[in-house]
Amino acid sequence: MEKFTVLTGIAAPLPMINIDTDMIIPKQFLKTIKRTGLGKNLFDEMRFLEDGAENPDFILNKAAWRKATILVTGANFGCGSSREHAPWALLDFGIRCVIAPSFADIFFNNCFKNGILPIALPQVEIDKLLDDAGRGSNATLTVDLENQVIRGPDGGQIAFEIDAFRKHCLLNGLDDIGLTLQKGDKIDDFERTRAMSSPWLPIAKAV
């Protein structure tokens, strides 16, 4: 998993509440188990018209926000089904940070496991960031995970909270597999000890 330390980029304002996972990545695109290739269908029903053409009114189709890496949005983001394809689609599009007043629990947890930083802030601070994001490519936000602050284009700072363990995992690029591999020596020691104390177990397992 790619490390998350400091992210400076364009923020796209999407001030909608209750954006569910089917809006993030519709069900017809869930047949794949690959984490790549889903970005082109992110927010598919909002980004594209019925004839397949881009919706010119959708924020990510506008020139100033096409390369957004930060999303500032409304409350209860990621509600609905537990599909992990939702953070996959965001990440594949290029979104590394989502800032909202609140998140659905499962989506919130899945973000951390896929290298995306979800930040929950009071609505008054979201409103300020939405205003900043509305400037498009003329203004960028900087998300500093180590110091737990968001810096706006005017030099102002907004502090945010994050669980210490999740912060450690993002800073070091550790997903569940990465965390397990850190214990590789201990796992190998256990397997050697088990093979000597219970030599029949590997044979029984093979059968």
UniProtKB/Swiss-Prot annotation:
Described purpose of this protein according to its UniProt entry: Catalyzes the isomerization between 2-isopropylmalate and 3-isopropylmalate, via the formation of 2-isopropylmaleate.
Pfam families: Aconitase_C
TM stretches of this protein: none
Protein keywords: Amino-acid biosynthesis, Branched-chain amino acid biosynthesis, Leucine biosynthesis, Lyase
Name of protein: 3-isopropylmalate dehydratase small subunit
Pathway: Amino-acid biosynthesis; L-leucine biosynthesis; L-leucine from 3-methyl-2-oxobutanoate: step 2/4
Protein's UniProt keywords contain Lyase: yes
Lineage: Bacteria, Pseudomonadati, Pseudomonadota, Alphaproteobacteria, Rhodospirillales
UniProt feature coiled coil, ranges: none
Subunit text: Heterodimer of LeuC and LeuD.
InterPro entries the UniProt entry points to: 3-IsopropMal_deHydase_ssu, Aconitase/3IPM_dehydase_swvl, AconitaseA/IPMdHydase_ssu_swvl, IPMI_Swivel, LeuD
Major enzyme class: lyase
GO terms classed as biological process: L-leucine biosynthetic process
Any one GO molecular-function label of the UniProt entry: 3-isopropylmalate dehydratase activity
CDD domains according to UniProt: IPMI_Swivel
Reactions accelerated catalytically: (2R,3S)-3-isopropylmalate = (2S)-2-isopropylmalate
NCBIfam families, sorted: leuD (TIGR00171), PRK01641.1 (NF002458)
EC number: 4.2.1.33
GO cellular component: 3-isopropylmalate dehydratase complex
Family: Belongs to the LeuD family. LeuD type 1 subfamily.
